[in-house]
């Protein structure tokens, strides 16, 4: 029997009910703290581009559906645009297949169009892609490539290979291949004096981003305000910021996180930015990141990098290769136009986009 529900805007005081919905919708989520008020405030209230747009569905005095986007500053072919990231979409298990999310999402998109936020992007799971593109006007852009470097060859082989006789026969070769690919990189001794752990980003991150940003691309604006909110201000996740500096100026950086990912202990390079004329600095940052991950006993290092060929080349030179097929999570990237101010062909063009793990909300 379908519950009688109605849609409305988020209201102050809904936070605990939204948390209860999260626990019902995602009972296997093991990231402790995602439903706490401090994290909710950080994710929805405190983004530097403004408060989230949230719609909820209510039935029997409880919240049974939730659709939200957070505003983000983007650069679209050189122009600053206020866009949005779709995240934390959920329906209570008792209220599936009642059109709740279609209703909530459509209302949010209408509001975004009226408010002048033309672009919404997101990373739906494979089961959601069809519904988004067929009924809600989304464009499928591409599957994003993750680059990985094995740090523990035996663990990688156990995870990737099938069981039984096939594993026993193939594992030695797989271990050898992973060991050869995953040879250690080391920081050049003269460059160690340039490496720093940062507590926060300063204005030189803005200058570095403007040097890196290709005006033909679409990308989130990686200025200090955004980076500090996204990483050091996150109350739940322990990011580390590794920087290469010269004469007090930021030349390259990587944001790192150690976590369980793909069924392995993953050293995640969440963001990776280097000055376009300083491949040496970027290589040094990658080597220092690998050293840190090995110290933390990670099984592999992983970096999602799309839209920057130079950085991909640096990853490959450092021993990173594309993750093999479905052995790891696939990242589907989709976008939606909420008004007619932006060219649909432009935003749906995979070659236009610059994307890293830092553009998601889950890494």
Report each predicted region and the residues it spans.
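Conserved acetyl-CoA-binding loop-helix of GNAT-fold acetyltransferases
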Residues: 91, 96-111, 279-291
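Short amphipathic alpha-helix that is part of the acyltransferase structural core
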Residues: 1-63, 81-85, 158-225, 266-267, ...
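Conserved acetyl-CoA binding element of GNAT-fold acetyltransferases
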Residues: 80-93, 264-276
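Conserved beta-strand in the GNAT
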Residues: 54-56, 62-72, 85, 90, ...
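Active-site/acyl-donor-binding loops of N-acyltransferases
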Residues: 2, 118-179, 230-233, 240, ...
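Oxyanion-binding "anion nests"
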Residues: 215-243
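A short helix-loop-beta-strand connector motif used in the catalytic cores of GNAT acetyltransferases and
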Residues: 43-56, 60, 65, 133, ...
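Tryptophan-centric aromatic hotspots in well-structured domains and transmembrane helices
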Residues: 37-44, 67-69, 101, 138, ...
């Amino acid at each position: 029997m379908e519950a009688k529900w109605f849609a409305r805007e988020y209201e102050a005081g809904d936070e605990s009910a939204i948390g209860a919905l999260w626990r019902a919708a995602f009972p296997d989520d093991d990231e402790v703290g995602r439903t706490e008020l401090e994290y909710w405030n950080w994710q929805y209230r405190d983004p530097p581009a403004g408060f989230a747009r949230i719609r909820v569905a209510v039935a029997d005095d409880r919240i049974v559906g939730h659709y939200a986007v957070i505003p983000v500053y983007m650069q679209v072919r050189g122009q600053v645009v206020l866009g949005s990231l779709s995240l934390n979409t959920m329906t209570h298990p008792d209220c599936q297949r009642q059109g709740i999310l279609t209703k909530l999402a459509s209302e949010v998109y209408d509001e975004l169009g009226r408010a002048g936020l033309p672009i919404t992007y997101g990373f739906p799971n494979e089961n959601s892609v069809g519904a988004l593109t067929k009924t809600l006007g989304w464009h499928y852009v591409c599957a994003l490539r993750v680059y990985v470097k094995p740090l523990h060859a035996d663990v990688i082989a156990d995870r990737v290979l099938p069981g039984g006789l096939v594993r026993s026969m193939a594992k030695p070769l797989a271990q050898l291949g992973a060991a050869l690919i995953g040879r250690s990189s080391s920081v050049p001794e003269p460059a160690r004096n340039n490496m720093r752990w940062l507590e926060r980003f300063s204005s030189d991150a803005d200058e570095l981003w403007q040097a890196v940003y290709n005006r033909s691309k679409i990308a989130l604006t990686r200025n200090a305000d955004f980076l500090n909110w996204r990483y050091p201000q996150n109350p739940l996740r322990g990011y580390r910021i590794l920087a290469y500096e010269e004469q007090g100026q930021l030349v390259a950086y990587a944001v790192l996180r150690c976590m369980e990912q793909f069924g392995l202990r993953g050293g995640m390079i969440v963001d990776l930015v280097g000055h376009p004329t300083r491949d040496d600095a970027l290589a040094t940052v990658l080597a220092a990141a690998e050293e840190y991950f090995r110290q933390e006993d990670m099984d592999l290092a992983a970096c999602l990098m799309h839209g920057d060929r130079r950085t991909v080349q640096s990853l490959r030179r450092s021993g990173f290769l594309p993750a093999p097929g479905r052995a790891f999570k696939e990242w589907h990237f989709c976008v939606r136009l909420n008004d007619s101010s932006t060219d649909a062909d432009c935003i749906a063009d995979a070659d236009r986009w610059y994307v890293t793990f830092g553009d998601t909300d889950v890494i």
